[in-house]
A protein has these predicted regions:
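C-terminal region of N-terminal signal peptides and the immediate post-cleavage residues
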Residues: 38-62
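Short beta-strand and adjacent tight-turn residues that come in two discontinuous sequence segments
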Residues: 200, 231, 291-293
Length: 342
């Protein structure tokens, strides 16, 4: 080996040593940055409440999302535009931050309603009909017992970000499908109490005996502070749907509702409570921050946000029975990975 080759090799080894030292310095600096960032997050988590992120968007003179009807015959939709304002969801935190609302609120009951009307003769599921009188008495009893209605977005912001909740014991009131009676009967009662609710709307296929809300009525709910969520396009059995149908039912429904009403649509409601791992994955991939089931129990801070339990309120439930139902369900266990029921 001549002297020039030896010199080149020594120079190359020296250059490699300098590169290794530089990489070690960069790695050490990156580690320091991570430690500083973690400390900053910890300090922020122990500080005061932070304001939830909000998303405000407008849509004007758009076509109606869909006709809320049975086989295209019942219900109608409006074409005027509107705006909405709602707390937007971000990524779900693995470890949720401190709460600053009602003391000890690590779990919250979520009530489930369907039709607010007397059941017609021959109704296939009469138990899903709660009369306006029953609903009014139930809401007044909740108010008197110290409960306050909040939305799922508010609960999530409280658990994840430390945002404040209204005074009182929080309860989430959900309405499935998008029945006209929810607008006509439930909205006035909740508005009088200063309360809000979550509307899990499906875009097509409602029974002709009730029909669906018009786009204008949906906007009225949004203006009243209701949260707009969805059960998909047509309340299909998602547990038996192929991937293409899942995308249509889940992704398309969220996209159309967001475009039409200018709200985030952060939560999905499994139609008839039917879901499996593939459905959960599709819901998560579509951008939803969580989902509600029909499994009885309270939703908890430590639970799976894509398997939130709910309490079904049936027709004939007295105010005292509802309060007992809520209290008795608090100790229920976590929902199973799949739950098939109607």
């Amino acid at each position: 080996m001549d002297s020039s080759e030896l010199h080149r090799r020594r120079a190359y080894r020296a250059q490699e040593r300098r590169r290794r030292r530089l990489r070690r310095r960069i790695a050490a600096f990156a580690g320091l940055v991570v430690v500083i960032a973690a400390a900053a997050v910890a300090v922020a988590a122990t500080g005061g409440a932070s304001s939830p992120t909000t998303t405000t968007s407008a849509t004007s003179h758009r076509r109606a999302v869909a006709r809320h009807s049975a086989h295209g015959t019942a219900g109608r939709s409006a074409t005027s535009g509107g705006t909405g304002h709602r707390t937007a969801g971000g990524s779900t935190a693995a470890a949720l931050g401190p709460a600053t609302g009602h003391a000890g609120t690590d779990s919250v009951p979520i009530l489930m309603y369907h039709v607010i009307a007397a059941p017609p003769a021959g109704a296939p599921y009469p138990g899903l009909y709660v009369t306006p009188q029953e609903f009014t008495a139930q809401m007044e009893a909740l108010k008197q017992a110290g409960w306050t209605a909040v939305t799922l977005d508010q609960v999530r912001a409280y658990w994840a970000d430390g945002a404040r909740l209204p005074a009182g014991k929080p309860v989430v009131i959900t309405f499935d499908n998008g029945y006209h009676s929810q607008y006509a009967q439930a909205l006035p009662v909740l508005r009088r109490l200063g309360w809000v609710a979550d509307e899990n709307i499906q875009l097509t296929g409602l029974p002709p005996s009730q029909g669906g809300m018009t786009s204008g009525q949906v906007r009225a709910l949004v203006r009243a502070g209701w949260e707009l969520d969805t059960q998909g396009m047509s309340h299909a059995d998602l547990a038996t749907s192929d991937p293409a149908e899942l995308r249509y039912q889940i992704v398309t429904a969220r996209r159309l509702l967001r475009r039409e009403y200018g709200v985030p649509v952060n939560w999905f409601c499994y139609p008839s409570g039917q879901y499996n791992a593939a459905v959960i994955a599709a819901v998560r991939a579509a951008g939803f921050v969580g989902s509600t089931t029909v499994v009885p129990g309270w939703a908890s801070r430590s639970g799976d946000p894509y398997r939130l339990p709910r309490l079904r309120v049936l027709g004939g439930t007295s105010p005292s029975a509802l309060l007992s139902q809520i209290a008795g369900a608090r100790g229920d266990g976590a929902p199973p990975s799949t739950y098939m029921t109607s």
